[in-house]
Structures are given as structure tokens and as C-alpha cells.
């Protein structure tokens, strides 16, 4: 064979391969039919179907039809329940021993993404319980902790594939006994509740000063750009401070504030401080005394992420009652049931069901507490949390009634792909790339 023919022999397959890879991927359609579809936001469809197109929900109803073709996969639910994927808005899984940077009471520059262990089997265990999205938070050792990361439970996927795309940023604040205990045991500030809030207030004052410095710098650049005799390069930027930069984002509304808190009096103090500095509180986490101040929470559009009936495990939990979630909800508070546990996250459906027993929540109200409400707390309710057209196809097929101790997930889909199948328990490990 001549050199020229040999070269063509080698190049042509490469060109064909490149051309093939350049072609758009064939559309992928899934139709789940014969399901009891619990949408979370628009009631239940007794004999419903869901059409998924390229990972998004395309249609929901009693009868849906996808374009015919070999690319359509049919899943017969066999009359079983179909719900949105469960969302845990307070989790510490896959962070191992890196939950708390307890070297300073103010550490907003910490990023939980840097501690995220995407191979942690706890991700898969939660997935097996129907959890598809989690907010991984800094711990509660510090008055102002680090920045959270939002993940999808695509166990076996790459690290970047697990990160929830374009999720809003959140930061963890904490008040009460935990910061007191951590720093008080070292005989340093804070060691009291007044110390806690003094530390928080001082950090926010410093952030205000930092913002003013940067605002003045940017104003000078704008003035110099308008003045032909001046160069914008003449303006000297302030020194960057990652801690104050993060807190400035809080004050600008670019970082949602999630607060670990138990007592009613502390909630009122945090509300007052937020008004003092002009930022919004997204949610109070734990919030076991929310029932005492539910009117104030509703008036300020502050959600709670709470336990169903966990109480008495620490001093701050002595006034907890199992009716807390429903009492707050009846006052207009957006309520989520969260785990804060590698065990509870697999049973959040049962925890939500307890609100039906304690307080008389309806089926839809209970389901919202583990789907659309925590999605709102995380800031992703436009993408997940309900079975609606245009949302990510994060879905769970249950082998029994989901709001009971008898229903367990049979299949869990994330972005239209099956990541858990009870009949194929090793499915997730095959996704590793």
C-alpha cells in the first residue's frame, strides 16, 4: 500500500467518526404511564402519565403521547404512586469531618463545595430513599459559617455532574447554644447569646464598610471614564477580603441566608438584625419554637425547615411540639421537613407523613413539605419540587403509598435517567466515569 493510500485509510475513519460525533444526539423520550401521579402542586391524577423529553417533563395528564419512534422508552408503573423527587434542604452528607471550620466564629469565605466528597455512599443511601436534591450546609459551630452547595443525587456520576447547575448561593448562620459552647469552652467570644449577636453584628458592620470602599472605587472609575483628562487605571482598588466579600454579597442580596436557630426570642432578634442591615432571611432551620412566632415569620416571608417530632435532645428543644410544622403552616409560613441526618434523609416521606397525624395536614400539604417547599428554600423551585411541564424529570416510583411506613422507592429518576432501581441495587456504581 502506498503512503498516500495508507494516509487516506487512516484519515477517512477519523473524519467519519468526527462527523458522527458532531451530529446532535437523538432525542430521548420516556413515558411513565399507569401511575397515581402526585404532582405536589396540582393535586393527584389517579391514572396518569408523564412524558419526559431529554430530561425535562414535557407533559402530564391522564393521557400523554410522545412522537412515535425507537427513541421512546415506556415505563409501566403498574398503578403505583409517582411523586416528585424528595428534596432535603438541610443535609451534611458527603462532607465527612469537614462540616465545621471551627477556628473562628465568622467564616463566610468557606465553601462546602470544596469539601464535597462525591463518592460518599451516603449519597446513594439517600437516593434509595427517594432523595434527588440536597442542600449541603456548613455546620452550626460558627455564628456565620460557610457557603452551601446544592447537589443532585446522581450517584456514580462525576463530581461536576452532581452539582445542581446554576443553583442560587446560600450561606449558613447559627445562633444559640452551639456557638456558645464551641467558643465559650475556649474562654473566647462568643460565650453568651449577647456575644453571639455582637459577633454577627460586628461582622456585618465591617462588611458595610468594605462595600463602601468598593462602591467608592467603582464610582471613581466611572468618573474617570467620563473625564478625558483622567485614566480609569488611576483608581486603586481596595484589597480583596474573601470573608467580607461574602458578607457583602449577603447585604446585596446575592447570598440567601439560612439560619440554624431554635428559640422564639432568637428568631425575633435575627429578624430585627436582618431589617437593621437590609438583608432577607430565607429560612430558619430547626425552628422548634416557630409556632410561638409564626405570625412574625409569615409577615417576613421566612420559611422554616424543621423536624416532625424530634424533641428534648438538647436544652433548646425542650419546648418543641409535634404540631409545630402544621401550626406554622396554618399561619402562612412555608414549611419544610428536613433531615440533618444520614438516617432521616432516607425516611423523609415518613417524617412528612407525621404531619398528617400531628396537626391534620392534608396529603398535598405533607408532600409539599418534602418537595416544593424545600425547593423554594434552596431557590430551585422553578426547576424541581413538583411534577409540572418544563421542570427537571426528578421522579420517584413507589411500591406503596409514599406517605406511610409501607411505601419505599422502586425507581428514582434524575433528569430523566434512572439512578436507582430496587431490582438493580448496584445500578448507581455503573455510572462512574
Give residue ranges: language-model regions.
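Bacterial N-terminal signal peptides
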Residues: 7-18
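Acidic, glycine-enriched loop/beta-strand segments at the rims
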Residues: 24, 37-49, 62-64, 361-368, ...
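Histidine-rich, glycine-flanked metal-binding segment
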Residues: 24-28, 37, 41-83
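Divalent metal-coordination and catalytic microenvironments
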Residues: 35, 50, 55, 79, ...
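Active-site core of metal-dependent hydrolases
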Residues: 41, 47, 112-113, 137, ...
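His/Asp/Glu-enriched, well-ordered alpha-helical/loop segment
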Residues: 97-99, 105-110, 256, 295-398, ...
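Polyanionic/metal-chelating signatures
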Residues: 127-285
Amino acid at each position: 500500500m502506498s503512503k498516500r493510500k495508507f494516509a487516506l485509510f487512516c484519515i477517512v475513519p477519523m473524519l467519519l467518526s468526527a462527523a458522527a460525533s458532531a451530529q446532535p444526539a437523538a432525542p430521548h423520550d420516556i413515558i411513565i404511564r399507569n401511575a397515581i401521579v402526585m404532582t405536589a402542586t396540582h393535586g393527584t391524577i389517579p391514572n396518569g402519565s408523564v412524558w419526559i423529553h431529554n430530561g425535562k417533563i414535557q407533559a402530564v395528564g391522564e393521557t400523554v403521547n410522545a412522537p412515535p419512534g425507537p427513541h421512546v422508552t415506556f415505563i409501566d408503573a403498574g398503578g403505583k404512586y409517582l411523586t416528585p423527587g424528595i428534596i432535603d434542604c438541610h443535609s451534611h452528607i458527603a462532607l465527612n469531618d469537614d462540616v465545621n471550620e471551627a477556628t473562628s466564629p465568622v467564616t463566610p469565605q468557606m465553601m462546602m463545595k470544596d469539601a464535597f466528597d462525591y463518592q460518599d455512599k451516603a449519597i446513594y443511601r439517600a437516593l434509595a430513599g427517594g432523595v434527588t436534591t440536597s442542600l449541603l450546609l456548613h455546620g452550626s459551630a460558627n455564628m456565620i459559617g460557610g457557603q452551601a452547595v446544592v447537589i443532585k443525587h446522581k450517584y456514580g456520576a462525576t463530581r461536576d455532574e452532581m452539582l445542581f447547575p446554576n443553583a442560587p448561593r446560600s450561606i449558613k448562620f447559627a445562633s444559640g447554644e452551639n456557638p456558645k459552647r464551641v467558643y465559650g469552652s475556649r474562654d473566647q467570644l462568643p460565650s453568651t447569646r449577647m456575644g453571639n449577636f455582637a459577633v454577627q453584628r460586628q461582622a456585618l458592620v465591617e462588611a458595610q464598610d468594605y462595600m463602601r470602599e468598593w462602591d467608592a472605587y467603582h464610582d471613581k472609575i466611572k468618573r474617570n471614564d467620563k473625564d478625558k483628562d483622567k485614566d480609569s487605571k488611576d483608581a486603586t482598588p481596595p484589597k480583596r477580603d474573601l470573608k467580607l466579600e461574602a458578607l457583602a454579597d449577603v447585604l446585596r442580596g446575592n447570598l440567601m441566608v439560612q439560619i440554624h436557630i431554635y428559640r422564639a426570642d432568637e428568631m425575633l432578634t435575627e429578624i430585627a438584625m436582618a431589617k437593621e442591615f437590609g438583608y432577607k432571611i430565607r429560612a430558619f432551620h430547626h425552628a422548634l419554637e416557630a409556632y410561638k412566632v409564626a405570625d412574625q415569620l409569615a409577615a417576613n416571608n421566612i420559611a422554616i425547615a424543621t423536624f416532625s417530632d424530634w424533641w428534648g435532645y438538647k436544652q433548646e428543644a425542650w419546648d418543641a411540639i409535634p404540631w409545630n410544622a402544621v401550626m406554622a403552616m396554618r399561619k402562612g409560613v412555608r414549611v419544610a421537613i428536613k433531615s440533618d441526618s444520614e438516617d432521616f434523609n432516607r425516611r423523609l416521606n415518613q417524617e412528612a407523613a407525621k404531619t398528617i397525624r400531628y396537626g391534620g395536614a392534608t396529603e398535598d400539604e405533607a408532600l409539599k413539605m418534602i418537595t416544593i417547599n424545600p425547593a423554594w428554600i434552596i431557590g430551585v423551585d422553578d426547576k424541581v419540587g413538583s411534577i409540572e411541564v418544563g421542570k427537571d424529570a426528578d421522579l420517584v416510583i413507589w411500591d406503596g403509598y409514599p406517605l406511610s411506613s409501607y411505601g419505599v422507592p422502586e425507581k428514582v429518576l434524575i433528569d430523566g435517567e434512572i439512578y436507582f432501581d430496587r431490582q438493580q441495587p448496584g445500578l448507581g456504581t455503573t455510572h462512574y466515569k
